[in-house]
């Protein structure tokens, strides 16, 4: 290793986006919300630990898979050209090996739950593996990512109730639209580069209606979660949280209105606070019951 060159360990941390926690927090908050809803309150430290660590591990594994799949495209995109796999600092074999280890660790956590959750974990893995390749063939790959990022909701209900009730599917549908909203903001950052290399994204598909599409997706997400949970939560705290989430969505719309790269990326990064707001509303609505 030459002087000043990053160590392998630091390169692996870059690969899994260790310094960018917003990505896994976007996965965590709806999953924890589902855990609290399925349990009608605090689900216990075992499940909180399993799903918190599992979310981090699987998102990290997904980064490894995504960077391997996209390495020939990423070198043509300003924001991703220096990623470890793309630059050659980490080999494809190393990235896949690290991803496999992380996925196996996550599966080890799932094994401490029940058979229904274990079965759903295979479906979640399949969607996770499919997403990087959807960007080549699907005009709205963000919808595929939405399913992948929402599987934790189904698994949370399965872990608590040993089944996946209709409520879980409603929450998954709503969450899918949230993912479309924030990942379209993300795609707006790279749109010029993606057009040159032939990558398919919702930002390209929506064209001049991209901002409207983002705002409509936010509205659908918040509406579905509000209507699905209003009877269950039965709390002014939850409704305040929904109002705050809506206010954040409107702010994001203001940020992206001019389609500036930095503002679109800022809106994307701040989305985890919107997710946290909804989770806090759910968790606090059960507090003290």
UniProtKB/Swiss-Prot annotation:
Cofactor(s) required for function per UniProt: Mg(2+)
Primary location recorded for the protein, binned into one broad class: membrane
- Keyword terms of this UniProt record: Cell inner membrane, Cell membrane, Magnesium, Membrane, Transferase, Transmembrane, Transmembrane helix, Ubiquinone biosynthesis
Q: Name one GO molecular function term.
A: 4-hydroxybenzoate polyprenyltransferase activity
Reaction it catalyzes: all-trans-octaprenyl diphosphate + 4-hydroxybenzoate = 4-hydroxy-3-(all-trans-octaprenyl)benzoate + diphosphate
PROSITE patterns in the record: UBIA (PS00943)
Look up the domain of life of the source.
Bacteria
Membrane topology summary: Multi-pass membrane protein
**Similarity field:** Belongs to the UbiA prenyltransferase family.
Name of the featured protein: 4-hydroxybenzoate octaprenyltransferase
Role noted for this protein: Catalyzes the prenylation of para-hydroxybenzoate (PHB) with an all-trans polyprenyl group. Mediates the second step in the final reaction sequence of ubiquinone-8 (UQ-8) biosynthesis, which is the condensation of the polyisoprenoid side chain with PHB, generating the first membrane-bound Q intermediate 3-octaprenyl-4-hydroxybenzoate.
Q: What is its EC number?
A: 2.5.1.39
**Which GO terms are recorded in the biological process aspect for this UniProt protein?**
ubiquinone biosynthetic process
Give the gene name: ubiA
Q: Name one GO cellular component term.
A: plasma membrane
**Segments passing through the bilayer:** 22-42, 45-65, 96-116, 118-138, 140-160, 164-184, 211-231, 236-256, 267-287
Query: What subcellular compartments does it reside in?
Result: Cell inner membrane
This protein's pathway: Cofactor biosynthesis; ubiquinone biosynthesis
